[in-house]
Amino acid sequence: MKTVHSASYEILRRHGLTTVFGNPGSNELPFLKDFPEDFRYILGLHEGAVVGMADGFALASGCPAFVNLHAAAGTGNGMGALTNAWYSHSPLVITAGQQVRSMIGVEAMLANVDAGQLPKPLVKWSHEPACAQDVPRALSQAIQTASLPPRAPVYLSIPYDDWAQPAPAGVEHLAARQV
């Protein structure tokens, strides 16, 4: 059975987002598990540098860039560079790891208390899927939203236990969407 993890990587692959810019922490490890051989990971030592590299990559290539940040702390660290990306109209698809679903709302260590609000107003769209099965659709929507005029960064908070969950039936059409 296809997992949220494998379905999400297929969506990224089909949209050409095979370069991942990041500075991972524990919340991002399930996403990075079984990292595809046809993807490359650009490691930055600080989230500001990571977002800055992705911003430059998107501007130089004319294509969206994919960023994976560490929870709320990493998102906060990347906000200065996110400001530049916002004003440059860079199509960044930014994901951040979130605490496991059962810990959201109890202010556990590494939980982003109000994930959808944290990066605003520096993103065009910010979202945390309501359930694991909604992650592939939300990722597809993030890519589409970042890519459509006016291009701009988007943000998606993903609880780290979502990656191992079964993907919903019929997610294949999400990878085939074109802007």
Roles of regions detected by a PLM:
Residues 1-179:
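N-terminal alpha/beta PP-like core and its mobile active-site loop of ThDP/TPP-dependent enzymes
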